[in-house]
Structure formats: C-alpha cells, structure tokens
Amino acid sequence: MLNSWPLAKDLQVLVEIVHSGSFSAAAATLGQTPAFVTKRIQILENTLATTLLNRSARGVALTESGQRCYEHALEILTQYQRLVDDVTQIKTRPEGMIRIGCSFGFGRSHIAPAITELMRNYPELQVHFELFDRQIDLVQDNIDLDIRINDEIPDYYIAHLLTKNKRILCAAPEYLQKYPQPQSLQELSRHDCLVTKERDMTHGIWELGNGQEKKSVKVSGHLSSNSGEIVLQWALEGKGIMLRSEWDVLPFLESGKLVRVLPEYAQSANIWAVYREPLYRSMKLRVCVEFLAAWCQQRLGKPDEGYQVM
C-alpha cells in the first residue's frame, strides 16, 4: 500500500520527459532546472516503489511500470484540467439565449415568475419562454430546456428532478352535497368527471395509485377542456370531480372551497427539467436548471418530501 499519493506535478514531469526525450529538455519546457526534474522523478519512483525510467547514453526509456504510469498520468492530467476549467468557469457569468418550454398552467403560475427572478440574478441571459399544450420534441421545437410534469422521460433526453408532485381528486362541497362521494375508483364512472387533456395526460384515462396498487380508470362527464385553469374553475362551481396537481388546488383545499375525493389515491406527476446536453457543457443551462430546482423546492417542497405513487 502506498504511503502517499503521487502528486500531479510529478506526473506532469514524467509526461514532459517522455514527450521531450530528456531530463534537460523537460526542465526547459517546465521552466525548472535539471536537478528539480531529477528530484521529482526520484520522489515519484519512491512513492510508487518502482523504477519508471531507464537512463542511458542514448536517452531515457520507460520501463513497463513507467509505461503504465505514463498512460495513467495522461488521463489524470486531462481530468485535472477539466476540473480546473469547470471550477474557473463557475466564476464567470452565464450569458446568451436559452429557450425554455413548459405547459400553460404551471408555466404561467410558477415558471414565469421564476424566470423574472432568474433575470434579476443573471441579467446577461436572454430567455425565450414558450408555452405548449402538447408534448414537444426539443430539437424540432428548438427548445433548450423543457419543464415537464410527467415521469415518462424518453431515454434520449437528460432529466433532472426539480421537485415531486402528485395529482389528486377534488370536488366542491356543493357537488358532493348533490351526489354521494365515491367510495372506490369504480364508482367514479357514475360521476360527472371534469376531464383535462394536457400535455402528458391521456384523455379520459386517470392513472391512480395508493402506494400498493396502480389502476387505470376510464372517466367521463359533460365537461372537458385542454385548459387546467378552466377545469379548476368548473370544479369550484360544483360541476364535477377533477384530477389536478396538488400545487394548483392546495389554496382551495385550505379554504374549504374544494375537498379531497378518495384521498388515499393520487397520480404521480413529478416536475422535471428535461434537456439534451450534459450540464457541464453549458453554463447557462446549468444555472437555469439549478435556479429552477431551488425555486420549485422553496415553494413546492424538496424532492424527498413528495408523494411516491406506484
């Protein structure tokens, strides 16, 4: 077992010797004396407890151990440079255009105010914010970062969990005074259900779980819309039972204008940042994702505080 780890500067000395062909040439490249180069190689060999270089009148040659050390040294020094570049990059300010997409309801209520705050912190950024009522293709729709309320993310995208979320069943007290509250998922078929067709939702099918099982429930009613805001208004007016995100209905639950229906059931609808390229390649993308994660967690709860549905 090694008493200590090789130092990066000693690995650099070894690489320079191999590239230049001699101790003196390596010393000149490094701006050091030949004695310094000799000393660092001795320290490296002592650290690794092996001979790395054979010196002769014709020059220097790597031993078998030296060849392995040289190959690893190249990899280590490359990674070291990436580390330095990444840390140095953090000190600079992100700038340029970034295109962000989202659904209408969540985009208006949460992401738009978040972008306003983002621009206060990073005024060099330019943000184009576009709302969609459909699932989008990042390439075809020219979007750098899409905010999705949907756990089914294609494998060819990268996804970062912003916060956990669930959709819950709700109705106004006025509706439940007219019609008996359902006691099972099957009884939903006897009720006026307010059907929403948003980006990720199949029209008329509610996927509901209780932590032990998950069921697909076919529902119908006299009213349906592709706008969650309209469906929420209908529910408040006592028109039926709806399935909406908890962040959307929580104020009305607290005020008593809405009540939970079948509270043991919910639909997982976690909130994700979806993008194509790794975050380390783009500072503006990384800054936006990290900012939106902090924003959502501050207002909607941290990822480990959410509801997990089967």
UniProtKB/Swiss-Prot annotation:
Name the domain of life this protein comes from: Bacteria
Q: Which residues form the HTH lysR-type domain?
A: 6-63
Q: Which residues cross the membrane?
A: none
The alphabetized list of GO BP terms reads: DNA-templated transcription
DNA-binding region spans which residues? Answer: 23-42
Concerning PROSITE patterns, the annotation shows: HTH_LYSR
Q: Which cysteines are joined by disulfide bonds?
A: none
Keywords noted in UniProt? Activator, DNA-binding, Transcription, Transcription regulation
InterPro entries in the record, alphabetically? LysR_subst-bd (IPR005119), Tscrpt_reg_HTH_LysR (IPR000847), WH-like_DNA-bd_sf (IPR036388), WH_DNA-bd_sf (IPR036390)
The protein's matches in Pfam families, at most eight in alphabetical order, are given as: HTH_1 (PF00126), LysR_substrate (PF03466)
Molecular function as annotated in GO: DNA-binding transcription factor activity; sequence-specific DNA binding
Under the heading NCBIfam families, the entry gives:
PRK09801.1
Described by its record, this protein's role is as follows: Positive regulator required for L-tartrate-dependent anaerobic growth on glycerol. Induces expression of the ttdA-ttdB-ygjE operon.
Q: Which family does it belong to?
A: Belongs to the LysR transcriptional regulatory family.
Name-wise, this protein is HTH-type transcriptional activator TtdR
Its gene name is: ttdR
